[in-house]
Amino acid sequence: MTARTPQALLFDLGGVLVDIDFGRAISAWAPYSSLSSAELRKSFTYDFQYERHERGEIEAAEYFDHLAKTLQLDATHEQIEHGWTAIFVGEIRQTRVLVEAMRGILPCYAFTNTNATHMAAWSRLFPGVVGAFDKIFTSHELGLRKPERAAFDRICHLTETPASSIVFFDDLPENVQAAKKAGLQAVLVRSPDDVATSLRPLVRQLRKASGETTRRAHWEGRSG
């Protein structure tokens, strides 16, 4: 960590607190497509429409129509949505426990690239994750998504926290690099151990800062 004492923690959700697998969506859509499973996997991309959907610029119905055309799906919106929400594998409990522990020390926020349909699903499936945070910021509600610089600037504004005083945890290198360019402290998460390892020195740093503040107040009181 950098020398700046953290004032808030910011976590990604997918890949950090919730395990996701888009292969599950491909498997669910396969019976409705004229493409092979391999062709489906190749055809599904995080394309322009995907990003627009995550910014809330288009509704689910328009995005599902795009998927139906791109993946050659002869399926209803309900059937496409069933596959779309099948990506959530489970909660990464070890990280959630760490967030809950840190919340007693610092404000804990989440910022996730998502959409209204996925948000409804993970909010229902993982209430413990949702409840672990002071606030969850979502790309489709902000109209901004990672790794856009404006997205990080907006989070700093909404939390009233200087960028250099936020520690950000994400599983994608491009998001971590973008956060650093925006001035945040950032950690690449490949496993819950990366979160735990990064938090240990952070807690020591906070305790040291707290101790120095206490000692300063003590001596100022004596001198007064």
Language model region names:
Residues 104-105, 132:
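Structured helix-beta-strand junction loops
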